[in-house]
Amino acid sequence: MSLFDTINSGGTQLLGVAWPTVWALVRILVVAVVILLCVAYLILWERKLIGWMHVRLGPNRVGPAGLLQPIADVLKLLLKEVIQPAQASRWIYMVAPIMVVVPAFAVWAVIPFQAGAVLGDINAGLLYAMAVSSIGVYGVILAGWASNSKYAFLGAMRAAAQMVSYEISMGFALVVVLMTAGTLNLSGIVGSQEHGFFASHGLNFLSWNWLPLLPMFVVYFISGIAETNRHPFDVVEGESEIVAGHMIDYSGMAFALFFLAEYINMIVISALAATLFLGGWSAPFGFLSFIPGIVWLVAKVFFLLSVFIWARATFPRYRYDQIMRLGWKIFIPVCVVWLVVVGFWIMSPLNIWK
């Protein structure tokens, strides 16, 4: 019996019919706290990694090796005053950061951490993740409009156009995964990558979707970078043009919520990419299956997050017209072509997803 089963059975005996509600709230709270800690130390890892790429030390003053720097940053932001512009639409101005950060948390309801460990194992998990993650753009638009600033509004318009453009190619990539797996359930998609010729010979990593769906994997991940407005697609908050974009008139914790949502979305994109294309919690080799699945998922997510950071430190920022051209003239045609190719592949005798 697993630890979760033991807790569940003990809680049922202790609280009776109230236990399912209490257990759901406890799991949600634990996941939320873990996500917040991951965001805090992801920011530290980003600063450290970019520092090493720049041949400098990075933050190293607060705590041993700078490990307490995220806590110091949070305390600083908590003590900052939230200043509202005189001409801002007050309620919309305050609601906008919440509308950005809530969907980022909500996506985690359907992401499986290992077999049987998921908050909500619903059959339409993939559709839910795509739909909920698309809501955040409304908060960005409201933030730009409510600030009553031309720079904030320009950043919001850029964000809306960019996020809508790249959601199309991400949607195509998810449709192709759906075609091969035959299910919208994320646990089922991971399970569909655990069988086949290579998996039966212990080479699990060659049976994952990244190999047969490599163009879709590349398109999905790059589109994810654009969706999160990360470098080199960060024209929304281009420091050399419009400073912080839609966040320019925010301060204190209101400003921090936007950054919190950005880094949570980075982890979400990486977790979904690992689940859909890299086998989720599956071990890369059969003889390593004794290691808990959550360890493999965390390792894959950490690798993809490091690629996010590497891209920031390596590539120059794209012009806005180049970003739109990449999304509409390259990614969408590639997705349509590969969608047709995979369709014929599935219908042919060479179908590897049977």
Curated annotation (Swiss-Prot):
The membrane topology term of the UniProt record is: Multi-pass membrane protein
List, in alphabetical order, the Gene Ontology terms for molecular function in this entry. NADH dehydrogenase activity; oxidoreductase activity, acting on NAD(P)H, quinone or similar compound as acceptor; quinone binding
Catalytic reactions of this protein: a quinone + NADH + 5 H(+)(in) = a quinol + NAD(+) + 4 H(+)(out)
EC code: 7.1.1.-
Principal subcellular localization: membrane
Biological process terms from the Gene Ontology for this record are: aerobic respiration
| Highest taxon above the source species | Bacteria
Give the CC-aspect GO terms.
plasma membrane
Q: Which UniProt keywords apply?
A: Cell inner membrane, Cell membrane, Membrane, NAD, Quinone, Translocase, Transmembrane, Transmembrane helix, Ubiquinone
Q: Where does this polypeptide localize?
A: Cell inner membrane
InterPro entries, alphabetized: NADH_UbQ_OxRdtase_su1/FPO, NADH_UbQ_OxRdtase_su1_CS
Bilayer-crossing regions: 25-45, 91-111, 126-146, 170-190, 205-225, 267-287, 290-310, 330-350
rRNA-binding in keyword set: no
What is the role of this chain?
Answer: NDH-1 shuttles electrons from NADH, via FMN and iron-sulfur (Fe-S) centers, to quinones in the respiratory chain. The immediate electron acceptor for the enzyme in this species is believed to be ubiquinone. Couples the redox reaction to proton translocation (for every two electrons transferred, four hydrogen ions are translocated across the cytoplasmic membrane), and thus conserves the redox energy in a proton gradient. This subunit may bind ubiquinone.
Give the multimer and partner information: NDH-1 is composed of 14 different subunits. Subunits NuoA, H, J, K, L, M, N constitute the membrane sector of the complex.
Q: What's the family?
A: Belongs to the complex I subunit 1 family.
PANTHER family named in the record: NADH DEHYDROGENASE SUBUNIT 1, NADH-UBIQUINONE OXIDOREDUCTASE CHAIN 1
Question: What NCBIfam families does this protein's entry cite?
Answer: PRK06076.1-2, PRK06076.1-3
This protein's name: NADH-quinone oxidoreductase subunit H
Q: What is the lineage of its organism?
A: Bacteria, Pseudomonadati, Pseudomonadota, Betaproteobacteria, Burkholderiales
